[in-house]
Amino acid sequence: MCSSFFIYKDFGIKLRWKENLHMDKDIHWMKEAIKQAKKAESIDEVPIGCVIVKEDKIIARGYNKRETTQQSIAHAEIMAIQKACKKLNTWRLEGCTLYVTLEPCPMCAGAIVQSRIERVVYGAFDPKGGCVGTCMNLFEIQQFNHHPQFESGVLESECSDLLKKFFKKKRMNKKQKSVSI
């Protein structure tokens, strides 16, 4: 396994790089997570999507629903984890990989640890709240009894472009409303 460090150019963040032996599968499943993000966008939610895979099959899908449900915990990862637990009839999601378009926040990273997900793959880095390497890494806290493996930056530009376009549109709509008042 090859590893080194690099500086993520947009944020000046030092990240660990290692060879991803699952890249083809990771790209395939991240495209499925992007489809979920587009569902969120279609209902005017922040476009974040998630799929959970076990034995090369999607067992759960989720996308952001905070505005729709008015629930602060209705993040894509939480929605998918709840569905996966129900489908497998267990809270232990051992042997599962979670794919999400944006780096998990503290709440979602905690839920991933608590549900014993084996591996996490995310697309876009979150410089304001990412807790799997950008702001901090909850997966590497030694006192925790579970430490998921993780890969970052898979289809990063596609995932971050979805978010950038969404928020650009929101800002434009806000400007248009303030001009018309």
Residue ranges with predicted function:
Residues 7-11, 17-43, 91, 104-181:
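Zinc-dependent deaminase
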